[in-house]
């Protein structure tokens, strides 16, 4: 006796339509970006936020990159300029030590006309008397920008000394400055995304007035 077919022609047609619909489904905006980020270990430090970050990037794409990935920390330039560099590095301590960095002895030396950080007793200028004159003259805000650039440079020197692949990049929303830690591979992925906004791409801050390294196009 022959066994009856387990699937009727109608059922087979329905299954075929479902499969065809699935294969033609429109990918989410961030699918390709998410795949590249996964390959470059973007979520390595995200901890319990990793799945939420993945979902947001898949749904929104590039704009969702700057969430709670464990790579982003506040870095207000004005706070840094007012003697906040040592506290800033201390805030980054868990991340830096995770990269193998040995934090040196740091001490703020904030004076009326200058600010330096003593790194194991050696003076690292954050802003000088001449910088203050520029601040009070035609370049308001320059001490904050210089403090950020020189603080980031200090952090990157520590990372380089520890042989870490991560580097401190600045991200600026127009209202606040933050530091975002990225590898060369990750910054390349971010720059190559077709919907990337050039002036919001993370950048290495410089001491060059007036944009201090921030892309403008």
Task: Give names to the regions the model predicted.
Residues 22-23:
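C-terminal motif of bacterial Sec signal peptides marking the signal peptidase cleavage site
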Residues 2-13:
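Bacterial N-terminal signal peptides that target proteins for export
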Residues 26-217:
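Contiguous interface-forming segments/domains that mediate binding rather than catalysis
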